[in-house]
Amino acid sequence: EYVLNYILKKNGIDPEKDLTVEYKSEATEVAAALQAAGEGAIAVLPQPYVTAAQSQIEGLNVVLNLTEEWNKVSTDSDLVTGVLVARTEFIEQNEAAFEEFLKDYQSSIEWVNSNTADAAELVANYGIVAKAPLAQKALPACNITYVDGAEMKAKLSGYLQVLFDQNPKAVGGAMPGDDFYYGA
């Protein structure tokens, strides 16, 4: 909701006056609503659900990529939709193991992006996406990246600021302090 509102407002569209947005809690609800609405319907779906919907709904096209649209209107942040979180106490008590985990995590991301066919098999085997061919098609569009340190802090803090500006409760009522960002 906040991401869509931000992008719309930055493009001169008032989401409360210029259009009607109907939010759904499940991607399957969105796909069903698209099918019921017919031609001209518009939806926002994350990957891999957009790829799944395209396999079910003939003529369904991606006309806007939220990451690309975010980058057009925001120069001081990135659209961050997934992060790794750990308690400070845990990291302090297990620093070497945590650093090793981060290296493995980064390698895993690089492997997934370089080996989409093999990664898709794993994604399907673990039930993340129903079928490997669907996962293989969706993975390149998932924008799976590894960012850490000062770069991560800059990207994430800018994103959190956008959320905070719309609704402070979206980030727990206050912007996180510098100690929130590991290795920054």
Across the structure, where does each feature detected by a protein language model lie?
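A local structural motif
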Residues: 9-25, 29-32, 39, 169-178
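Predominant activation on well-ordered alpha-helical scaffold segments within soluble catalytic domains
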Residues: 5, 51, 157-161
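A general structural signal for well-ordered secondary-structure junctions
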Residues: 14, 40-41, 59-60, 118, ...
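Ligand-binding cleft/hinge of the Venus flytrap
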Residues: 1-23, 36, 52-59, 121, ...
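Secondary-structure end/capping motifs
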Residues: 91-166
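Pocket-lining segment of extracytoplasmic ligand-binding domains
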Residues: 29-122
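Short linear loop/turn motifs
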Residues: 19-22, 136-143, 175-184
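Conserved C-terminal helix/tail region of periplasmic/extracytoplasmic solute-binding proteins
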Residues: 157-184
